[in-house]
Amino acid sequence: MIILVLLISYSFGKTQDGKDQLSPNYPYGKMNKDVNFNKPFTSAVDSYQIQQYAENGVFSANQENYVRAKCKTCCRVIFASDYNYKTNTQFTDEDDKKGDERYVMDMEFDDKRSVRFRNGGYEQNILLRPLKQGNELQFFEFAPYRMYTSYAIPKRVHDIRGGANEGATLIIWPKNPPLSDAPGTRNQRFVYVHPYPTEWYPEYNSTTKYTQNGKTVIKTLKWPTYKRHFYLPYRLDVDLCYQARKATDGRSTWTGNKNLNTTSKSYQIIASRCSATEARQIFIPVFA
């Protein structure tokens, strides 16, 4: 197993320009009259386009049923891709020694004030971007009910744009109540398969039933074999996992990102058929 050592500094509460992100003057929920999505813009805070500012409380975790500062099961984590974009292969120990650049899950914007209100067509991708010390947007949390929360924006979680379908991209989206059956809730639930022995997973080789085209299908579960993968349990007819796009792949675009250029190299993450050996599907959690 590759040992990934990262030196991480962390800042909280202030933006890159020194302003207080939690200021009561932040225009929560307001429409932005000066927005223009028809010309190029970047992920920088003074360029990124916002059609409507996010709702009040988006930066706060105090509405949860736990006290975040005292939570003993909350884990702040960076998810590093094990795919080396320099060699187009899986990272090796030698690659790490040489200092080849690691890409980690990050936002498509550079400052958390750029989080948008939940409007279709303006969804915001979670991208792979180079590791940057002090960037709080690269921190996530293992949350209850198989959800993955942005540490800097606790009301936003991993989601799949348009549902758990092949090629659909990973986004952030407002967190549904964990026990809710509201539409889209199951798209916010994922299984990170830790590299424990397969037999340690009680689900392995168990069966589940589902209906497809009016017929009952019995499926044998195999997802514990996809070590260090994010598995999408919502789909039962096919095993889907997160997968990073290649540098040569095109991007999925919509109104909110068709003219976006990130200030660093970035790659989308999509739902793809699971492969135990595909390096672009392997993610290493680095706890901090």
Swiss-Prot record:
Record membrane topology: Peripheral membrane protein
Q: Which residues form the signal peptide?
A: 1-15
Q: Which domain of life is it from?
A: Eukaryota
Q: What is its main location?
A: membrane
* Residues the record marks as carrying a glycan: N205, N261
Q: Pfam families under this entry? A: Gal_GalNac_35kD
Any one GO CC term of this protein is:
plasma membrane
InterPro entries linked to this entry: Gal_GalNac_light_su_1
Compartment(s) where it occurs, according to its Swiss-Prot or TrEMBL record: Cell membrane
GO MF term set: carbohydrate binding
Keywords (A to Z) from UniProt: Cell membrane, Disulfide bond, Glycoprotein, Lectin, Membrane, Signal
Subunit note = Heterodimer composed of a 170 kDa heavy subunit (hgl) and a 31/35 kDa light subunit (lgl); disulfide-linked.
Function per UniProt = Light subunit of a heterodimeric lectin; the heavy subunit binds galactose and N-acetyl-D-galactosamine of host glycoproteins and thus mediates adhesion to host cells.
Instruction: Please state what the protein is called.
Output: Galactose/N-acetyl-D-galactosamine lectin light subunit 1
